[in-house]
Amino acid sequence: MGITILFLLSSCRKNEKAKTAELCRELENSVMLSPAFDSLVKMSMGLPNFFRSKVLLVAGRCYSTKVEQMQQARIYLREAYRIAPRDVKNLVALELTRLYGSLILRDSCVEEAIRFISRVPSKVVFTREEEAKFYYLGACFFKSIDIDRAFRAVDQALSLYRGLSDTEGEIEAYRLKATLYGVLQEYEEQYACYEEAYRLLRRSRFRDKVKPFYEQMAASLKKLGRHEEALLWYEEVLKELPDSSRLGRYGIQVAEAYSGLGYHEKAREILRGGLMNEKRGGMRNV
């Protein structure tokens, strides 16, 4: 009798797992707020909380930049967070924190988001890497409303990333910290953060996945009056551009860097070349 019950429970569990996987696949191929999408979410209501929270997590990731979809994703993720067991709640917390960062400038849920982010550390058990990511996402959220809190969060993220072998997250955290210093117009500190990010990038196995930030480094140096160094980084930017769009939207910046060095004729030559490209439909910012 006991063996039969165990067999039935095991069979039921497999069916629930298979149904969850199927619903998740179909959600990823559907459009949020469509009747088909809503129907798939409703079909998860008969699943145990463990599986339903996974379905809601996937549903909450399927939003675009439309505010209506973000609002609906927020509903899915908050419900997933409410019912999720510990080994799913951490993933939901990260996704909801990321979403709040997307909503911050165009939604009315700022206070709700602050309460949520403030409570997560005492409610959720993260791995070290997840915790670092949480503080990074928190800093992204706070950078628009509380610069001091954003600095504290990114510093917590950096302290956690330093204990990990994966440097991709640490690079992104230094870039975010550089952005925060830029808001304060503290360009020496900003460039120091970019330098550290670049040092990590050079030895990272993820260097092909990290979006280059040479333009930001050059802009920071230009604000410090270090035009010659800025020009070197703008040249690195140019190397990344296809030959058909040489200079591209960086023509003005490169020309300003040459002008700052006193090479005014060279700057004029670049701008004249940019104007010719504009006439051919190639360059739009000169």
Model-derived segments and spans:
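Structural signature of alpha-solenoid helical repeat junctions
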Residues: 51, 69, 88-92, 128-130, ...
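Residue register of alpha-helical TPR repeats
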Residues: 18, 54, 91-95, 133, ...
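Residue-level recognition of tetratricopeptide repeat
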Residues: 25, 61, 98, 102, ...
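Position-specific recognition of the canonical hydrophobic site in helix A of tetratricopeptide repeat
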Residues: 28, 64, 105, 136, ...
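Eukaryotic all-alpha helical interaction scaffolds
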Residues: 44-47, 63-64, 80, 84, ...
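Single-residue signature of alpha-solenoid repeat helices
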Residues: 36, 72-73, 109, 113, ...
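Structural motif corresponding to the intra-repeat A-B loop/turn of tetratricopeptide repeats
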Residues: 30, 66-67, 103, 107, ...
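N-terminal leader/linker segments that initiate helical-solenoid repeat arrays
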Residues: 12-78, 82, 86-91, 95, ...
